[in-house]
Amino acid sequence: MIGIDIIKISRMGALLERFGSKAMGRFLSKDEIELVKNHKTASGFWAAKEACSKALGVGIGAECGFHDITIFKSSNGAPNIRLSQKIVKEFNVKSISLSITHDGEYAIAVVTIESTAANKI
């Protein structure tokens, strides 16, 4: 399955300026917050988590929350994605890939998920 999301970076900027790190804690773990350098990075992480939930076919909600999805960086700085064991098991996730890009005022993310005879997908 494939999921895609786009967010206007200034929208994330306004959210973070208004609510600060408290807002980031709603959708990012402490480790993820440490990776966020600016509004652009936060926007990419938001888009990645939204795209992942869409690839699972459920969106962000009761079945898959923001904290079930973790964004981390590889040794060469590329973004990677990891799912909680609950999500891996429930959706029979075999593999997952992430791409994040920024263009002008937008952050865009695409997530692909391969699963075995999934319950949900």
UniProtKB/Swiss-Prot annotation:
Its main location: cytoplasm. The keyword Zinc-finger does not apply. Transmembrane segments: none annotated. GO terms for biological process: fatty acid biosynthetic process. Keywords: Cytoplasm, Fatty acid biosynthesis, Fatty acid metabolism, Lipid biosynthesis, Lipid metabolism, Magnesium, Metal-binding, Transferase. GO terms for cellular component: cytoplasm. It is an enzyme of class 2 (transferase). Mg(2+) binds at D5, E50. Its cofactor is Mg(2+). It holds the Pfam family ACPS. It is found in: Cytoplasm. GO terms for molecular function: holo-[acyl-carrier-protein] synthase activity; magnesium ion binding. It catalyses: apo-[ACP] + CoA = holo-[ACP] + adenosine 3',5'-bisphosphate + H(+). Its EC number is 2.7.8.7. InterPro entries: 4-PPantetheinyl_Trfase_dom (IPR008278), 4-PPantetheinyl_Trfase_dom_sf (IPR037143), ACPS (IPR002582), Ppantetheine-prot_Trfase_dom (IPR004568). Belongs to the P-Pant transferase superfamily. AcpS family. HAMAP family: AcpS. Transfers the 4'-phosphopantetheine moiety from coenzyme A to a Ser of acyl-carrier-protein. This is Holo-[acyl-carrier-protein] synthase. It comes from Sulfurimonas denitrificans (strain ATCC 33889 / DSM 1251) (Thiomicrospira denitrificans (strain ATCC 33889 / DSM 1251)).
